[in-house]
Amino acid sequence: MYKKQIVLILIALSTTFIFDNVRAASTLDSLEQVLARLPDSARLIKLNDLAYQNPDDYSYKIYAEKLLKEAEQQKNNKYLGNAYFLLIKYHYSHDIDSMRLLLKEAEPVFLNGNNLEYFFRTKTWNIYTYEQQENDERVFSEAKLINKLSEQLNYPEGKEMVDQAIAHYYSSN
């Protein structure tokens, strides 16, 4: 009796999952057609808006990846920085290793675009990941490095972000 119920539940769940994926794919296909007809600058703006509108949805990552490609093609540092920020934010919750790789790629983009908030915010997220991994040594070495960069770049908000991360570290331990 229980086996039949479990099988029926699994079938219902998988059917729902399949239909949701098909619906999402068709929406993205339609969007691809609309985006292809837009001028370059409008395409960047639309992709950026779509990525920021769906922060809790998987399509958020897809839009951010499309924004990254489009911004690279158009050599637009502003939107390139936005795309990196969104992808780092996504991977912060899903895949720390990918987050760190993207962070290395994004740092020069953030600095060249003078987007210090994104630079320091993402560097500080890295401190939180070391805290989650219980890597105390890296928590403090990264904090020290970021504080030094904050001073060099004359961006006191960077130090504030680090102070919050360290306060969180101490309150969690």
Positions of predicted regions on the chain:
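A "functional boundary" signal
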Residues: 2-8, 21-173
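Bacterial N-terminal signal peptides
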Residues: 8-17
